[in-house]
Structures are given as structure tokens and as C-alpha cells.
Amino acid sequence: VKLYLVRHASASDVAPSDADRELTKEGREESRILGAALRKAGTKPEQILTSPLLRARQTADIIARELNFPDEVTACDELLNDHPLDKLLRAVKAKETILVGHMPSLAEHLAGLLGSTNPAAFSMGKASVACVELATLRLGQGELRWFLRQKQLRLLTS
């Protein structure tokens, strides 16, 4: 099983509520670059799950478009902050899944997948992605295949 943990791209700080923060122009471009880099890497997700917050949904939709993803992107409350990893893993129904969410939960999830007790070591900048491979969807059993920040993603697609 391959999981791609993605932090949403840059979003506006001005919105009626945190849930309504939209991607900025830069954030839309970051998402496009992220999707293009995943396409170049041969990523073929069978499932894309996203936090229901607008900035994450927009990030996921742009990535899906870049990957010519044929299905719907699915909103998943388990990708909101403060939801346990075991519940998120129950939502994963495919061998290759993109998960779009938020800090600090993404770092906590990444640490949990890899069997680390130090989530601070996995701090993810906006529009970054980590690929974890697991034989089975079990905590602490993952192997980090790669972790790319936006600057590296830009180099891959230029």
C-alpha cells in the first residue's frame, strides 16, 4: 500500500472562518506543481481523500486534475486535525491513496505510520508530500520512500 500524505497549499488568511480559507494564486500554482510532480513520478492513485476544509479540497481537486484522476475526490473528516490515525487508516480503501490534510496532524500521522515518537521530525511545509509504503495498513509498519517540499517539487517539474 502506498500513501501520499500532502499538506494543503498556501491559503488566504482572510475568510469568514478557518474552514472557508481559499487557496491563493500562489497556492493554486503550488498545487498544480505538486500534481505535476506526482504525475512525473508515475503516481496513479485509486483514491484521493481530503480534509473537508476548503483549502484542502481545492488542493486535492487541482492534484486530481493534474493526475487525470477519473473518480471523485472524497472529503474525509479523519483528515481534520485531532483525529486518530487508526480511524484515518480505516477510510483507506485502495493500494495507492493520496491524503490531503493539515499540520500538525499530518506530522503525527507520518510519525505513527513510521513507528516514530517524534512528530516534530516530520514537519511538513505547505504543498509538500511524503510517500509511505506499507505491506499492510498497520501503525508503525511504514517505510518512508520520499519526502519532497515545494522547492524540490518545482525543480522536478521545471
Regions found by a protein language model. Give the residues of each.
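Active-site-proximal alpha-helix that buttresses catalytic centers in soluble enzyme cores
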Residues: K2-H83, A91-A94, A107, S116, ...
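Residue-level signal for well-ordered alpha-helical positions
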Residues: I62-I63, G112-L113, A135
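Acidic/His metal-coordination segments adjacent to aromatic residues that form catalytic metal sites
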Residues: L88
